């Protein structure tokens, strides 16, 4: 039986990881949630206990040590990811400090395996294909603090003989997505018969359904593979074609308005991941 503690369990990615793990045998789940979300896991079979916090990133190392008793695996998903604000928010620093306290507590505990969540934005995005050995070159506070956590925990857990996995997520979409994100925004606009104002759409991205990403994360949490993992589709597609696929389901290609928004400054032309983990 594997006792798994999960942070960020109610979020976009975390909820799907919870659902994926809840379908597996020999798993006990211990999600950490904010106090106001007490009843969210009522229908989950594998949830054995729920830990509550007002602010996970302000908890002390001693608080974490108590929560880690009898835990075998930690999946750390929690982070500040408010749409439109997270990339250069100073709250990334709080997330880094809080995550390092968790890491220190894990290093001193009986936990065997730690899965952290990173981002494709850690890489040098001038490269055409992004492999786990592609040079890192983070450009914003979000990716910089993620790299800082990755490099710190990688060394710490090597010293302490803990298994460490770092899952770099690419462009996820699907259930529970913030309605301001690309896929959810297009769905919302077309459902209401409204135009979806988009950029040129020429950018190439590696999109993956969050459910598929969650399956990869849940599977690797119970695996023996260690190190950095790209969680991606390996199927690059232009934003224009991605949007057109969604619009085709509604029969409303006419509502896609490309070029109505400016492309983001310094936005990469291509973000294309190469998997290094057997998704099956």
Where are these regions (language model features)?
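N-terminal Rossmann NAD(P)H-binding glycine-rich loop of SDR-like oxidoreductase domains
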Residues: 4-24
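NAD(P)H-binding glycine-rich loop region in Rossmannoid oxidoreductase-like domains
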Residues: 53-94
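SDR active-site strand-loop-helix element
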Residues: 7, 32, 74-78, 114-120, ...
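Conserved Rossmann-fold NAD(P)-dependent oxidoreductase catalytic core, especially the SDR/UDP-sugar
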Residues: 76, 100-141
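NAD(P)-dependent short-chain dehydrogenase/reductase
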Residues: 151-205, 210-214, 245-247
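C-terminal substrate-binding subdomain of Rossmann-fold SDR/epimerase-dehydratase oxidoreductases
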Residues: 190-280
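Active-site helix of classical SDR
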Residues: 95, 141, 145-148
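Conserved glycine-rich Rossmann-like NAD(P)H-binding loop of the short-chain dehydrogenase/reductase
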Residues: 26-37
């Amino acid at each position: 039986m594997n006792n798994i503690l999960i942070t960020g369990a109610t979020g976009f990615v975390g909820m799907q990881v919870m659902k994926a793990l809840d379908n597996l045998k020999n798993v006990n789940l211990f999600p950490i949630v904010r106090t106001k979300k007490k009843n969210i896991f009522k229908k989950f079979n594998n949830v054995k206990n729920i830990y509550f916090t007002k602010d996970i990133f302000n908890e002390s190392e001693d608080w974490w040590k108590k929560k880690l008793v009898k835990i075998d695996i930690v999946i750390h998903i929690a982070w500040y990811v408010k749409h439109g604000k997270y990339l250069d928010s100073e709250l990334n620093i709080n997330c880094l400090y809080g995550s390092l306290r968790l890491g220190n507590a894990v290093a001193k505990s009986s936990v065997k395996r730690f899965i952290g969540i990173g981002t494709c934005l850690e890489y040098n995005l001038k490269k055409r294909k992004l492999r786990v050995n592609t040079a890192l070159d983070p450009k914003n506070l979000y990716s910089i603090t993620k790299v800082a956590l990755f490099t710190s925990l990688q060394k710490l857990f090597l010293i302490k003989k803990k298994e460490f996995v770092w899952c770099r997520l690419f462009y996820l979409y699907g259930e529970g997505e913030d309605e301001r994100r690309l896929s959810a925004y297009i769905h919302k606009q077309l459902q209401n018969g409204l135009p979806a104002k988009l950029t040129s759409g020429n950018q190439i991205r590696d999109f993956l359904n969050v459910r598929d990403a969650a399956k990869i994360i849940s599977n690797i949490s119970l695996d023996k593979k260690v190190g950095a993992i790209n969680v991606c589709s390996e199927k690059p597609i232009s934003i224009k074609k991605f949007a057109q696929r969604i619009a085709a389901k509604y029969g409303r290609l006419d509502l896609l308005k490309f070029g109505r928004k400016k492309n983001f400054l310094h936005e990469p032309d291509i973000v294309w991941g190469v998997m290094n983990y057997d998704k099956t």
